[in-house]
Swiss-Prot record:
Keywords for the protein's UniProt record, in alphabetical order: Elongation factor, Protein biosynthesis
NCBIfam families assigned to the protein according to its UniProt record, in alphabetical order: aEF-1_beta (TIGR00489), PRK00435.1 (NF001670)
InterPro entries: eEF-1beta-like_sf (IPR036219), EF1B_bsu/dsu_GNE (IPR014038), Transl_elong_EF1B/ribsomal_bS6 (IPR014717), Transl_elong_EF1B_B_arc (IPR004542)
Recorded family membership: Belongs to the EF-1-beta/EF-1-delta family.
Purpose of the protein: Promotes the exchange of GDP for GTP in EF-1-alpha/GDP, thus allowing the regeneration of EF-1-alpha/GTP that could then be used to form the ternary complex EF-1-alpha/GTP/AAtRNA.
Gene that specifies this protein: ef1b
Protein name (Swiss-Prot/TrEMBL): Elongation factor 1-beta
Source organism (scientific name): Methanosphaerula palustris (strain ATCC BAA-1556 / DSM 19958 / E1-9c)
SUPFAM superfamilies (alphabetical): eEF-1beta-like (SSF54984)
CDD domains for the chain: EF1B (cd00292)
GO function terms (MF aspect): translation elongation factor activity
Amino acid sequence: MGSVALILKVMPESPDVDLEALKAAMRAKVPSIQDIQEEPIGFGLKALKVMAVVSDQGGETDALEEALSSIEGVERAEIAELTLT
């Protein structure tokens, strides 16, 4: 089996969400995260771009999306980019 590298765009619930605490919660819940970067959206809101590498087995990317979406302070998480490694 191979691996899949993906970038997910994670939207916080509001500009008031503590992004550092959110990053720590994501890293604790999903150990496969390689990097997290902030991306300004507008009106003080910033999205988090999360880079992770997971197995290419069926359901792994969906499970990652669901894990990130379930974290308190996250409005939604969606795959922005995906490539085989």
